[in-house]
């Protein structure tokens, strides 16, 4: 993929220039508005620091949550501005709006090396509009903030699969460059997508099988084995004839799953035991059961210990591993062992086998941090869940494609 990078921009010189950066600051917050996982902020720092050192007037844009196109204080980027100020050891101002009067005044008042964070771009309904002309008017307003010989740096890999104003349309209006994070993500995932070393093992989890049928199909054609756990495995087990009781089940997908198993049954690896509970609750009574042993009215919330062993045997022989999605409800300690076990197997494969191991962002990356696992134990932890999946599936990512123009 041929696109200009931050290094190219720095070589051209950024001193005194406005540089608009699309970052990914979609971080989880607790009820008090405190950031509970700052991984995405940390991942954005190399690009921001390089621009500060180059003397750029840095304007950061990002979204947080789903405010549905209207201003909602719950989704303000104020906690992010505070976290950035601390991480960069310099004040990061938060604009009082996205592209309005306050944003313009602050952007015009920036000195070389200053950083301004715009308020949540999704406070404006045009950001996510399906109408290109509508998005374009918003993109024009964002571009107008970069009045001093402006440039655009795309550094939010978690959003490059979206054709949104601050990701896609802005890149068509300014000289556009891939930031350090986007460059690293694309190069790493391209290595997995184009020339994975075999055996190549894909580990998929998460809630809905309907969201990942296309992914399973695409990756099963390239991988040697596809391990499936998490909520999505119950519809596949039902397709094999098991009664999954009250476990998460998409009945309308059973026929699709049957077809998938017929085509790729030799590659798909499913759990052999489960952890069932009386209800979806951290304190619920629970026990390890066989696939056909879920008590009536109970639901499975994790894979069992024999499944972890079975999956470990497959992962242990790998040379490339891509993992996206937890094996169970990892946020609840009683149902976190499957995810922790599989993650540890991947870490072991990295260390003992020299396997190239990639964690595909989203809940998988969050689980690594929440469970206190060694982040350095993986070859790469992606910041983009949906983006990394779509990339490996072979789909075109609008926010990357536009950089090649």
UniProtKB/Swiss-Prot annotation:
Gene3D superfamilies on file: Phosphoglycerate kinase, N-terminal domain
GO biological process, one term: glycolytic process
GO CC annotations on file: cytosol
Gene Ontology MF terms in the entry: ADP binding; ATP binding; phosphoglycerate kinase activity
Keywords associated with the record: ATP-binding, Cytoplasm, Glycolysis, Kinase, Nucleotide-binding, Transferase
Domain of life: Bacteria
Binding residues annotated for ATP, in chain numbering: 212, 331, 361-364
Pathway recorded for this protein: Carbohydrate degradation; glycolysis; pyruvate from D-glyceraldehyde 3-phosphate: step 2/5
EC category name: transferase
PANTHER family found in the cross-reference section: PHOSPHOGLYCERATE KINASE, PHOSPHOGLYCERATE KINASE 1, CHLOROPLASTIC-RELATED
Official protein name in the record: Phosphoglycerate kinase
Species of the source: Corynebacterium aurimucosum (strain ATCC 700975 / DSM 44827 / CIP 107346 / CN-1)
